[in-house]
Amino acid sequence: ETPALVVAHGSIKRVSNFPSTFVNPRNIDIWLPDHYSKGKKYAVIYMHDGQMLFDSAINWNHQEWGVDETMGRLINEQKIKECIVVGIWNTPKRHSEYFPQKPFESLSQAGKDTVTKQLQSTGKTDKAFQPVSDNYLKFIVTELKPFIDSTFSTYTDRRNTFIAGSSMGGLISMYAICEYPEVFGGAACMSTHWPGTFTTNNNPVPSAFV
């Protein structure tokens, strides 16, 4: 059992092993700002790699993004509007869940084989690589978002719904806003892992995004 998270601002509500018909169950950590009230409505930011966001004590590398500190400070300084952050934990399928599926499927078979070999060489897959990011986004849009909107006091429109991540999380955030522009009004794609694999030599992936 993962210990309760320690945050500097606001509070965390955890849903353990959130079920899905599209992806494997995973923990969801919902950060609520200081003075959260059912009498107000809040924008929502969906963030990938949820276990890395709030508390370094639970992470493999003992580092965290400091999302609670940063969001709390920016809200208190009135630099951003009050919002909720939904931290979506990753799983061992992280690379295939975060890898944009339609660009991959647009590659020739030779291109797909090249990607598979490049990912096999770094231990990211032990078989033919197949992204499952379309199902990951269906999980967020059709299962997780309705739960968040029905459980917490949120604005549900695209102007108040955002998605964010770093590295492969940046890549899937880019894919999310392209696939669901009617759902997400903005995406923060930080240090985006544009190569998709771990080499730029003979890599067909970046051109597939164009």
Where are these predicted regions, by residue range?
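Non-catalytic cap/lid and distal C-terminal segments of serine-dependent acyl enzymes
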Residues: 2-210
